[in-house]
């Protein structure tokens, strides 16, 4: 299993409960696909450098997880079609040297 991290930006006009539900939806997707969530860090609402889909700010979330490339591909597919996510980036973390 490889280490990945995903940062995604949620629409700022969602209620707090809806924002929490979006985060839980993606962490549940990772575990359902056989991955393991190691860290969830909600950075909160921040101003973006430029306008994205007519939004000047967004709710930032960082999730670190372990999984196969198939887990990352499925997560990317779902993030891409989600209306609540305005931007995302999945990166593979380097393995720690022993």
Swiss-Prot record:
The keyword RNA-binding appears for this protein: yes
Any one GO CC term of the record: cytoplasm
Record bears the keyword rRNA-binding: yes
Alphabetic keyword roster: Ribonucleoprotein, Ribosomal protein, RNA-binding, rRNA-binding
CDD domains noted in UniProt: bS6
GO biological process: translation
Family classification: Belongs to the bacterial ribosomal protein bS6 family.
Main function: Binds together with bS18 to 16S ribosomal RNA.
Protein name: Small ribosomal subunit protein bS6
Native organism: Moorella thermoacetica (strain ATCC 39073 / JCM 9320)
Top-level taxonomy: Bacteria, Bacillati, Bacillota, Clostridia, Moorellales
């Amino acid at each position: 299993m490889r280490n990945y991290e995903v940062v995604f930006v949620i629409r700022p006009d969602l209620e707090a409960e809806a924002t929490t539900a979006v985060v839980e939806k993606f962490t549940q997707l990772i575990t359902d696909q056989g991955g393991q969530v190691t860290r969830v860090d909600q950075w909160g609402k921040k101003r973006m450098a430029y306008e994205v889909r007519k939004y000047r700010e967004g709710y930032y979330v960082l999730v670190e997880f372990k999984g196969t490339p198939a887990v990352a591909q499925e997560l990317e597919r779902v993030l891409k079609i989600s209306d609540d996510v305005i931007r995302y980036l999945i990166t593979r973390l380097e393995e720690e040297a022993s």
